[in-house]
Amino acid sequence: MAIEPFGDLLRTPGSAGLGAVVRAEKSPYIDGGTRYDMLPLYLYEGERLFLHGGRAGIKLLKQDDDRVDLFVEQRFEGFSADKIGPALAGMAPRTTGLDLGISWSSKRDWGTVQAELLRDISTASHGTEARVAYGYPLRSGRLALQPNITLSARDASLNDYYFGVRPGEATATRPAYAPGSGLNATVGLYGSYDLSERWRLLAGVSRTRFDRGIRNSPIVRDGAQTSVYLGAAYDFGAYKNAWASNRSPTYVKVLHGNASDSDCILVKIVTLRCTSTKDVGGTSINGIQIGKPFIEKLNGWPLDFVGYLALVRQNEKGFQPNGYRVDAFMKAYYTGLPWNARVQTRLGLGVGVSLAQRAPYDEVASQAARGRPTSRLLNYLDPSIDFSVGDVLGSAALKDTFLGVGCRIARGSSARRSCWAA
């Protein structure tokens, strides 16, 4: 796997961008077909913080052309229970993971060198990977290209999880197998084309040759793995660093939510067409979210971006032990509604990831009915609407106090929905 194929799109410090890339990747598994992933590109290049698509982190050191980062990144590997061929029948799915990593990069006239160390923190594989990469940026007019080569040293835990066969999964034609540690090599070519001052077309292709231990696995097909990328991104330009400003507000949100049926969406809640939650087995959550603004009044529009960290307690109503989860997400707020001069109202949409102490009960029950495994790592959407309590009551002291409702629509191995008030 290449290191951040589109991680250098923002050229101006303090800038932000938004886009998406479709990745088509030939599965390494026998009868695995082609996997398609829609990869959202949330881009932000702050003084200390950054977002590079599926990677978010902190700049520990930034000196001229040398940089050290601490980051988290989602690992897109494995196969799900509903997308397996005959060669994988009867095997437990191999799920995507979440890695914690540290990286070093150095830009020189002769190219860019990067090294990083990653460790799974989602307990999917418990694996570790070390990568080193070299790229040479080329530019001609609106076209920017970067050929790249990456070497990835993977430990036995990582390879055994994604490419091994456990003893309980062995059959007459699929013996138990553990590939052990190994070294993969990836070559790639990635590029962007400036359609305008702000819009960029993105494309890339890479090819990975697996270590011999992986290639000899009874579930891995012959040949290298090819990936193709195609997408677009919009560069909003540079903005004052709202996060670091002395006047930057801190958002504190206290919430309570109950699990709801799949058709109880935000629109129905607001219009009072869904005023109750699950009658049977409905679990609940209580939590606190802390947020800081990343961008205020984007492009002069009534649109703010706020980054949040949250600690949430899962109340499982006796079905299983209660637990905690940590959420990290970016949320956009639209404040341009026609009545906002009288009562400030915000429409919000958040996108993020959640790592739970144990898989939530709703996830466990839903997946058990389908005969599928659960996941502690969930991606989710967070739509909401809230209003200023001070504007409603005519109190200037409560002007910045908001009350609202929302839904947390999570998807790990399945979809689950919790609706909350805050």
Which residues does each PLM region occupy?
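Short loop/turn motifs that connect adjacent beta-strands in outer-membrane beta-barrel proteins
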Residues: 3-14, 48-65, 110, 139-145, ...
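Outer-membrane beta-barrel "beta-signal"
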Residues: 39-43, 224-251, 422
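Transmembrane beta-strands of outer-membrane beta-barrel pores
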Residues: 22-28, 46-48, 72-78, 108-110, ...
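Outer-membrane beta-barrel initiation region
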Residues: 2-61, 67-97, 237-239, 262
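Membrane-embedded beta-strands that build the outer-membrane beta-barrel scaffold
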Residues: 20, 53, 68-70, 102-104, ...
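Glycine- and aromatic-enriched membrane insertion/assembly motifs of diderm outer-membrane
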Residues: 35-78, 99-102, 106-118, 251-318, ...
